[in-house]
């Protein structure tokens, strides 16, 4: 090789010594690391100032874990302080950290675990399992319920740390860090900096953020305050703006500080606010990065910039959707989803889970009734459905179906003056009229939003001619009988319509075009009536006679299957729990 060719190829090679690799715990081959990065590993390690611990492995998540919205809120505890306290409390379900997707600062609080009476049932189960397959399944119990920093052990990309106040149990996949001799704020800020990401790229090159790699992170305290309170505050507020947070209060579109005369103007105001929040978060994250870049002396290796896709707020479409969509496509998707969330919240108000007159959950316990609602909201502006069955049909067959109820809800929340404009904005955002959205897309969206553990269930005939929603937490043994009565009422309406269309067909004075149209309607109606007859005879009536009893503690997966083919099938519902 010529001297010139040798010079040209040198730029493709890194020079590093084996002695440098030995400076890093585990001696990984980080050939690209600079001298300053190697030097950082001479500092104290995270294990010297904090404890990084794995949590429990239940060995049967399907039995012991639930998404928090599946069970009664009064049976759920989010603020237990110790194992001793859990021994005395009456609740069955306790906040449980299970890792989750890439999200910094706050969030992914979705699960609860059966820890009734200090985990009596789970401890007994694990004791039996250990006789067959010994193993530490309930690890590090002295750390249960303590304030901590959690992270996802397995990741498809960047590391992310989140704050947990006291009250959580935790999983092997949702490992936690407990500060000892370092400030919680400093450690938390450091872990979410790009400096720590650079260290983890060396320590955990496979993106399996094990406690071994986490414990080896070099630790230095900065010489100036970190902006962690602002970062955490923004992240928590964003998480709590959505129904899947147990601290959800109300829909941002209905917050008084965003409210404008029209829904369109309100959305524009909200979107401007969310842009501002995202930009502020980006500036704060960059400030945080710079603080730790300076602390470690890595100014030549790293810059403080943060890609907009890494600002982990749900109101940020670049993070929420990612991919290669254009700005216009991202904005359209966010607008459509925000309006879909408005419709979802409206359905929650129709069933009494929420109220426009009271923040947070209203009816969220097994067997809750309208009377329970009225005790909490004595003079509601929007009255929930009385019998817990709301028809969801593609025509105006019932005055109280989901579409008509939504129109009332829209008038209550945004007034009569701009009603038509508001409805037009909703339909433009969704790309279809409201009735079509409810009949074609709402349930799919709901199942996805609630992670295949829906709280509103859809009774549906095989081809969807008849469908009706119920709210799981208000289910009673006679609920299926109420659905059956709606089906029979609907069948009668279809039979009457069939007679009307048949009259047109045989009317000698009717125009031929009208006769042709009527004949097509007759053929469709006959098929629909047969479908409804089959659904009643083979499915709904037999189920109604069984008076099936459900227990929310059994979870949506088990309970949904108890009503069998009366409900719309959910693909993947029977998949094994993670």
Role assignments for model-derived ranges:
Residues 252, 279-283, 290-293, 297, ...:
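Terminal accessory regions of large proteins
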Residues 1-148, 225-352, 356-387:
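Polynucleotide-recognition surfaces of large bacterial nucleic-acid defense/processing enzymes
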Residues 142, 152-216, 223-234:
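Basic, amphipathic alpha-helical recognition segments used for DNA target recognition
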Residues 17, 34, 55, 193, ...:
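Helix N-terminus capping/helix-initiation residues
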